[in-house]
Amino acid sequence: MDSRRRYPVLLVVNDRQINEVIIDPHYQLKHASSVNDEIILALVKKLDGGIFESDDADDEFEYFKTEPIEYMGKSYRLVWLLKYDAMYIGVVNAFRRSKK
């Protein structure tokens, strides 16, 4: 399995300047047939300008689940995090969701 992959971006999320997306390869275990890094980056870019309430937090990170996020007519869930005092979004998982 590949290690985490890093991509430069210019986004503002939760009023924070974000300059990097770090994608964990976890999604490839079950979702490689429907999700890839390109799709994940497109989903992350849809967060730009948004304010999101965290689902959980610890001493180091805030954790988020955002769904549905639409891309190319399909619905996805994005599981991501922000590290306090850091300028990146970490993507923990991403996968297709059925439309409701």
Language model features by range: what are they?
Residues 1-100:
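Ribonuclease/tRNase effector modules and their secretory precursors
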